[in-house]
Amino acid sequence: HPSFLAMCTGNLPTPAANTAEDEGPYKYFTPKLYTGDGASTLAITGLQFQPDWTWIKNRDTTDAHMFFDSSRGVTERLTIDTAVEGTDADTLKSFTSDGFTVGADVKCNTNTEKYVSWNWKINGGTTSSETDGGINTTCQTDADRGISIIQYAGDGGSSDVTMEHNLGVKPEFLIMKDRDSNGNNN
């Protein structure tokens, strides 16, 4: 029929951008490259949000990956290759409205060394205690974006367990770290 158009993107209307409703991924996840200066305080800015979870890796050396989150507190770090979580005031010092601040620790701020950080906004650090699963959890969740930080104490057994994550759907991807020992990271 001559008045019909082919069904393709070229024939579909283009919606006008609405910056008031713009929910692009950059508002919730931003990678950031930076160069250390070795000073006691280095501000990393330009994220356009205050992160709740920051993952830092030195790109010039084999230093450990470090994880920080607003649920546990900024100086509480997790590293993949160490036995337990640690507290270090010279690593991540603060989450800020536009990024974060690091101290002089070599794993996050050696003069002239290059770093990458991956940064997620979740919900501002608000947690809830959940008892619906087989193991009690403390969750910081943004179900709309499908991300949550979960803390729990294992049951000490080898049986399968369930735990609440507040996402509303089965997670597609998990990162798990034993905070008390150098067990396998999953």
PLM regions with names:
Residues H1-N186:
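Surface-exposed molecular-recognition determinants
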